[in-house]
Amino acid sequence: MNKKLNEVLLKLDQDLIKCVKGSLDLEISGVTYSSKLVLPRFVFFALPGIHFDGHDFIEIAIQKGSNVVVCSRDVDFYSPNVTYIKVDDFNIRKFMSNFSNIFYDEPSKKLKVIGVTGTDGKSSVCYYIYLLFKKKGVKVGFISTVFFDDGSGSLIKNPYRQSTPESTEIHSFLSTMVKNEAQYAILESTSHGLDLETARLIDVNYFAVVFTNIGHEHLEFHGTIQNYLNVKLGLFRSVSDDAGFGVINLDDLYSSDFKNAVKKSFTYSLKSSKADFFVSFIDEKTDSTRFEFYHKGVKYLANVSLLGSFNVENVMAALILVSQILNIDIQDIVDKLNCIKSLDGRMDSINLGQNFSVIIDYAHTPGAFSKLFPIFKRFATNRLISVFGSAGERDVEKRFLQGQIADIYSDLIILCDEDPRGENSMCIIKDIAKGIVNKVENKDLFFIADRKQAIEKAISLAKAGDLVVALGKGHESSIIYKNREVFWNEQEVVKNAILSLEKSEKEK
């Protein structure tokens, strides 16, 4: 895609631009904030950051062919034939989003964009909506923590560490969806992505939105639960189309706030018959869940190959969204729920014939812990052994809560790394341990920072009928430390630990 720089700038808020040095009569062919991704005639945004400053990479970007640099401070050397656009630090991400949106011809206006937000369940709800659309033969694109689909029908793993990519990638991906003739786009809309400070989603035109729940997460970024809530409410307030609507979990404490933030909404509940969709009965099996729900006085019977009442909530959100946006009969969607399957790293059972069970799950919040641990306890015919950590440079307050919940249900706990980043691993572990009051260190509570060794310890301690749960990583392919990122595959680590145990037992 090629555009004239001046044509793009004419459509932007001129008040955001402090000054321009160089020609505006330039052809540009792309937009990026990463010097690694720069190609000839790319606009390079020098974003300030916590660990890296884009201004330090301006020369590299120019060497690779960038002919336009957007910066928030004066640079040491101005290259001829390069245009420099200066904006405020605070506005540079907003300007990048505005610029990307215009450069890619406002792609979200050519799609019906569905945003899913909440503390827990976002990725699963996005995936279930995607699967139901596909089952109905609808062309759809998809951006989530785990998977992407650019509208071509092919799922790829999310290539970014962020659930919601930067605005340059969002609008580029939406543009590709338009080219691939997708009708709908599903966006996992995180609080980081929705926040005005990151400005990743501010130029996305949403048609329908889903709210799952609010819990204790990301307060290191938002400061207070009210700020966190307001960011998510902003998504609902952004729905301007008269035909647009919201889908809301009525069981959440903040559901009324979300109802008030959107003109039209549909609610679902596992507790209240006042909801538009009320789940009145749930029967959990070891490999599936059967449930019934009512809508406008009509009873529907459904069955899914998923575990847990929390997944019934997720399925209901997807079912309502798809039936309403496509304006089709509820029973039509109920009949197609057999297409729904578990997302990678969610309630992922590892069975190599061992006499104990192992489940891997991405759960990393107190809310997710409170929903999953009762299920784990029911599944464990003997002891429950839990392996988990908590993210470094993230919400510190949740660590105590994670430990507290795990302590109630677990027989043994092994604390380890999740993503320590720049924090000391043992400091994080001890923060979690403050919530664990019913365990004794080195008896039924172990501190093993190395996650591989922690999992191996759990597997070595497992006896017949035990359930080992490894939480917090799920599908993720790396562990982040201060100055390095280490490849990680939880499934392979667990499998290797089981095989090593079996080998050592045979050699005895």
From Swiss-Prot:
Pathway note: Cell wall biogenesis; peptidoglycan biosynthesis
Post-translational modification: Carboxylation is probably crucial for Mg(2+) binding and, consequently, for the gamma-phosphate positioning of ATP.
GO biological process terms, semicolon-separated: cell division; cell wall organization; peptidoglycan biosynthetic process; regulation of cell shape
Domain of life: Bacteria
GO CC terms, sorted: cytoplasm
Record: residues binding UDP-N-acetyl-alpha-D-muramoyl-L-alanyl-D-glutamate: 35, 163-164, 190, 200
Pfam families, alphabetized: Mur_ligase, Mur_ligase_C, Mur_ligase_M
Secretion signal span: none
Predominant localisation class: cytoplasm
Positions contributing to ATP binding: 118-124
Enzyme Commission (EC) number: 6.3.2.-
Keyword Ligase applies: yes
Keyword Ligase: yes
N6-carboxylysine modified-residue sites: 232
InterPro entries: Mur-like_cat_sf, Mur_ligase_C, Mur_ligase_C_dom_sf, Mur_ligase_cen, Mur_ligase_N, MurE/MurF_N, UDP-N-AcMur-Glu-dNH2Pim_ligase
Gene3D superfamilies named in the record: Mur ligase, C-terminal domain (3.90.190.20), Mur-like, catalytic domain (3.40.1190.10), MurE/MurF, N-terminal domain (3.40.1390.10)
Swiss-Prot/TrEMBL keywords: ATP-binding, Cell cycle, Cell division, Cell shape, Cell wall biogenesis/degradation, Cytoplasm, Ligase, Nucleotide-binding, Peptidoglycan synthesis
Cysteine pairings via disulfide bonds: none
Sample GO molecular function, one term: acid-amino acid ligase activity
Subcellular location(s) of the protein: Cytoplasm
Function: Catalyzes the addition of an amino acid to the nucleotide precursor UDP-N-acetylmuramoyl-L-alanyl-D-glutamate (UMAG) in the biosynthesis of bacterial cell-wall peptidoglycan.
Family assignment from sequence similarity: Belongs to the MurCDEF family. MurE subfamily.
Protein name per UniProt: UDP-N-acetylmuramyl-tripeptide synthetase
Upper taxonomic lineage: Bacteria, Pseudomonadati, Spirochaetota, Spirochaetia, Spirochaetales
